[in-house]
Amino acid sequence: MGLPWYRVHTVVLNDPGRLIAVHLMHTALVSGWAGSMALYELAVFDPSDPVLDPMWRQGMFVIPFMTRIGITKSWGGWSITGDTVSDAGIWSFEGVAAAHITLSGLLFLSAIWHWVYWDLDLFRDERTGKPSLDLPKIFGIHLFLSGVLCFGFGAFHITGLFGPGIWISDPYGLTGKVQPVDPAWGAEGFDPFIPGGIASHHIAAGILGILAGLFHLSVRPPQRLYKALRMGNVETVLSSSIAAVFFAAFVVSGTMWYGSATTPIELFGPTRYQWDQGYFQQEIDRRIRASRAEGLSLSEAWSRIPEKLAFYDYIGNNPAKGGLFRAGAMDNGDGIAIGWLGHAAFKDKEGHELFVRRMPTFFETFPVVLVDEEGIVRADAPFRRAESKYSVEQVGVTVEFYGGELNGVGFNDPSTVKKYARRAQLGEIFEFDRATLKSDGVFRSSPRGWFTFGHATFALIFFFGHIWHGARTLFRDVFAGIDPDLDAQVEFGAFQKLGDPTTERQGI
């Protein structure tokens, strides 16, 4: 036929058998990629420190999604929570990967079978003897089956009735674990941070899908609507399918970037807004005040702060700090976190407690400014020493650490104080190993950032794809010069069957 590369899909337009074959092959590729990617990530993943080197710091992409729906154990004897396990069962990380690769192989074979045996009686209209698909009926079948799957996931898997549940954690990502979830049927179910809404929405959407599927199986579309929406043209299916996919991609881009119960920070890392709003800093401050009210010293109060919570309060874990074109995991940037040095508390010689202004998300450099509790500037690291009034040396700033590895240690040497003030701009101060991975010191984004960027980008591309194919199917007669009321089932540019010796050969 001599088709150009961008028109090769024409060969499956009027060929239901091979249309199924290429979709089977596509699903085989998707499933095979998922399984292979899981095995690769498991080969490079280090589960030894779930607090300071969690999966999202290591750039894991598919492991968080498996963990989210209840897979936490490995045949290697470890679990996501850091425990050792003796019997991981069949549904371990490796088991899920193997299942996907096995499915991929079976789909590959079935794609080949359908490509070879394309001309089945099933695909021929009994009245005309020509290839035909009952697209409204197929729509009903798919709607019904996806509704059953959706309902089953919500009613059984998430609730723990027949399944493990899903990953549940506290608002600060400290106590996460897989557990069953009760559906939330009230207004609270619409709160994106309430896990019960995930169960109730899957159950409700599943029931709706089942009912809608049965409706489309039992009720034929009116003839005028059938013709108006081009329901007999498979490109209509393509257009509406692309619409469903791009809409879903936009939605999950939002739930990932802004955060929700479906994207726990223990699995995907914190959001940029948690840094912007001082979310973890406020929780740490609340805990310190509570401990002080109990009569504990500052050192004792800070020693009670979980290292995990302190690590979230560090700008290097902000997904917006890594450039989109800086490849690699977070660990390849600032390094592998080894330990928390403690909270740096600054004072001037007059006894004012000073706080370092934190670096905003979109700054690469930021002046070192220390303010008191009223926001008045008391000290800084000046750019021009000749004009300085608030330099660390002039003001006599000292630093003392509470909690962490330097608990109780103080410094009054100006160069050391300035070093820690500069590091305090980035949140809580941690020690990093940059040698192991040859980390370059340039921040990277987390899987949260990559997922959002990828899905938002593809959603935009798919949006244009929906417009393109929708226009092609609606205005097909205008574009192709084919009368829409023509009885013969033909496609412009596809009158013969490619590779079929029984079809008449003619120039197009």
UniProtKB/Swiss-Prot annotation:
Transmembrane spans: 21-36, 101-115, 140-156, 203-218, 237-252, 457-472
Major location category of this protein: plastid
Domain of life: Eukaryota
Assembly information from the UniProt record: PSII is composed of 1 copy each of membrane proteins PsbA, PsbB, PsbC, PsbD, PsbE, PsbF, PsbH, PsbI, PsbJ, PsbK, PsbL, PsbM, PsbT, PsbX, PsbY, PsbZ, Psb30/Ycf12, at least 3 peripheral proteins of the oxygen-evolving complex and a large number of cofactors. It forms dimeric complexes.
Protein's name in the database: Photosystem II CP47 reaction center protein
Localization: Plastid, Chloroplast thylakoid membrane
GO molecular function: chlorophyll binding; electron transporter, transferring electrons within the cyclic electron transport pathway of photosynthesis activity
Function in brief: One of the components of the core complex of photosystem II (PSII). It binds chlorophyll and helps catalyze the primary light-induced photochemical processes of PSII. PSII is a light-driven water:plastoquinone oxidoreductase, using light energy to abstract electrons from H(2)O, generating O(2) and a proton gradient subsequently used for ATP formation.
Family matches, as HAMAP family: PSII_PsbB_CP47 (MF_01495)
Membrane topology: Multi-pass membrane protein
GO biological process: photosynthetic electron transport in photosystem II
Matches recorded under Pfam families: PSII (PF00421)
The family this protein is said to belong to: Belongs to the PsbB/PsbC family. PsbB subfamily.
Keyword line: Chlorophyll, Chloroplast, Chromophore, Membrane, Photosynthesis, Photosystem II, Plastid, Thylakoid, Transmembrane, Transmembrane helix
Cofactor note: Binds multiple chlorophylls. PSII binds additional chlorophylls, carotenoids and specific lipids.
InterPro entries, A to Z: PS_antenna-like (IPR000932), PS_II_antenna-like_sf (IPR036001), PSII_PsbB (IPR017486)
A cellular component annotation (GO) from this entry: chloroplast thylakoid membrane
